[in-house]
């Protein structure tokens, strides 16, 4: 679990996301409260429940990007899911308990990666012995092995092909039972049963350098205690797990509507116990959801937050509104983030030997076009900038291999020449921008 202060979390998010200070503060405080709770003792720790968050704002303003960046910062089991992927229990599709099962799998992968690092040195030695067995045979003399070991460590044998035995992937998707999402019966996965029956090794032909990571991971896994690993992962999910529920507005039941809305309301009802706190059976054991933090987000273009079930509204006590992007925000998005669009395009074309330069007037023109099209067609926020940039740089990207060594300067006139007319013609921009 990360021990960043709220101010440090916000400054990390500022490196990639423009504006939206309220949303950044809310998630920073929620993340810090996870750490604070773990410093408490016994009974009080159990009583402190997470304050779940509902983020409301139009599309393309940074809701999902905040989740993506938070996942990297959190150093905790984190899962982002779309609410529209799930159906009410009894309908064909995935039920919401699959969220927790998936979160457990994420946690196991995280813990395994961390523990592999602890046994890395021993795994490297064992993997090296397996490569030597493949090169000179298990019965070779110590002198021969030492000679090949030296060559192996200096990289002389990197391109040599060897045959190695690796673990065959288990579990086939064909063994799923209708109405049992993920092939789950209680806490047993059908896929796992068949995976164990067919858990054999297979021979693969690889170069020495390609086989290295595969063999090191296999040898590391042999040194790990799988039961302890799973227990640690479940503990991490129960105490530090974070679920980001995107598109929650799409499962709202709007006033005066009926028919296909039944399943939507059912999904909301199924989410209630999960967010409030329940026990979910997974193939690795029971998982309590009382202390998992849920962050829900939605554009709420058509539905309103009040269209959510009252019980669900009560379980998302912290409301954060994200603002629509202004012209100044668009301009900052093009230049300020560490991986801004302009930096990406400059780096991409640099690989062809083309140096791309953007004048301040070009950046202003790009922001103006994006804002104009958003206001006349459909407001899709910062995503409009990608469409505009692709259109402006279309000719340059196409001809870049023939223009190596050139320096191309983009100014306002160049932007207007490529997208100016389209931005003014609403009918055309509906289809092209």
Curated annotation (Swiss-Prot):
This is ATP-dependent protease ATPase subunit HslU. One of its GO terms (biological process) is proteolysis involved in protein catabolic process. Belongs to the ClpX chaperone family. HslU subfamily. ATP binds at residues 18, 60-65, 246, 311, 383. It comes from the Bacteria. ATPase subunit of a proteasome-like degradation complex; this subunit has chaperone activity. The binding of ATP and its subsequent hydrolysis by HslU are essential for unfolding of protein substrates subsequently hydrolyzed by HslV. HslU recognizes the N-terminal part of its protein substrates and unfolds these before they are guided to HslV for hydrolysis. Keywords: ATP-binding, Chaperone, Cytoplasm, Nucleotide-binding, Stress response. A double ring-shaped homohexamer of HslV is capped on each side by a ring-shaped HslU homohexamer. The assembly of the HslU/HslV complex is dependent on binding of ATP. The keyword Cytoplasm applies. GO terms for molecular function: ATP binding; ATP hydrolysis activity; peptidase activity; proteasome-activating activity. Signal peptide: none annotated. GO terms for cellular component: HslUV protease complex. Its main location: cytoplasm. It is found in: Cytoplasm. The lineage of its organism: Bacteria, Pseudomonadati, Pseudomonadota, Alphaproteobacteria, Hyphomicrobiales. Pfam families: AAA, AAA_2, ClpB_D2-small.
